[in-house]
Amino acid sequence: MGYIPYVIENTERGERSYDIYSRLLKDRIVLLSGEINDSVASSIVAQLLFLEAEDPEKDIGLYINSPGGVITSGLSIYDTMNFIRPDVSTICIGQAASMGAFLLSCGAKGKRFSLPHSRIMIHQPLGGAQGQASDIEIISNEILRLKGLMNSILAQNSGQSLEQIAKDTDRDFYMSAKEAKEYGLIDKVLQKNVK
């Protein structure tokens, strides 16, 4: 992630400098940006757990701008979103593709949003295998299991039938924010921040 901006606030004790991510965290905003891998997922999970410990009743905003990434890493974020007590509101800024779109759809019902020019894309899991035939079969079975799991969760989150999800995720399926709302992945397209 290159350059990280800092913000300066005046307090009773003088000026205080925060990196922008720490300052956002203070307002219960978590930013998921870039490819989802184990390192990124661990950081997101830690922030969600920290915010729950700070206030288990207050919503958390998860802002997503991601092309997707590793399925198991994304599922660790998904499980944590469901494990913690606060509602997690999801907001797509830019793009939510693959695992990014999956997590976008997993926000608390009624609290899944997108900015108007964002792009959302769902598809089936990607993977590859090499080695002995028995190893390839094991990996293939695991990918198919994950495909079934993710399709089932997407169907539950969107209100689409499992058959429709399977058909639509067979290839890359791109949507505008408006189309994602009609599909059921989000609840509202935001024009202005009302805070």
Curated annotation (Swiss-Prot):
Top EC class for this record: hydrolase
SUPFAM superfamilies: ClpP/crotonase
InterPro entries: ClpP, ClpP/crotonase-like_dom_sf, ClpP/TepA, ClpP_His_AS, ClpP_Ser_AS
PROSITE patterns: CLP_PROTEASE_HIS (PS00382), CLP_PROTEASE_SER (PS00381)
Gene Ontology cellular component list: cytoplasm; endopeptidase Clp complex
Record field: transmembrane: none
Active site (catalytic residues): S98 (nucleophile), H123
Keyword Protease in record: yes
Biological processes per GO annotation: protein quality control for misfolded or incompletely synthesized proteins
Pfam families from the UniProt entry: CLP_protease (PF00574)
Catalysed reaction, written as an equation: Hydrolysis of proteins to small peptides in the presence of ATP and magnesium. alpha-casein is the usual test substrate. In the absence of ATP, only oligopeptides shorter than five residues are hydrolyzed (such as succinyl-Leu-Tyr-|-NHMec, and Leu-Tyr-Leu-|-Tyr-Trp, in which cleavage of the -Tyr-|-Leu- and -Tyr-|-Trp bonds also occurs)
Main location: cytoplasm
Keywords noted in UniProt: Cytoplasm, Hydrolase, Protease, Serine protease
Enzyme Commission no: 3.4.21.92
UniProt family annotation: Belongs to the peptidase S14 family.
Oligomer status and interactors: Fourteen ClpP subunits assemble into 2 heptameric rings which stack back to back to give a disk-like structure with a central cavity, resembling the structure of eukaryotic proteasomes.
Function, in words: Cleaves peptides in various proteins in a process that requires ATP hydrolysis. Has a chymotrypsin-like activity. Plays a major role in the degradation of misfolded proteins.
Protein name, UniProt field: ATP-dependent Clp protease proteolytic subunit
Taxonomic lineage of the native organism: Bacteria, Pseudomonadati, Campylobacterota, Epsilonproteobacteria, Campylobacterales
The gene coding this protein: clpP
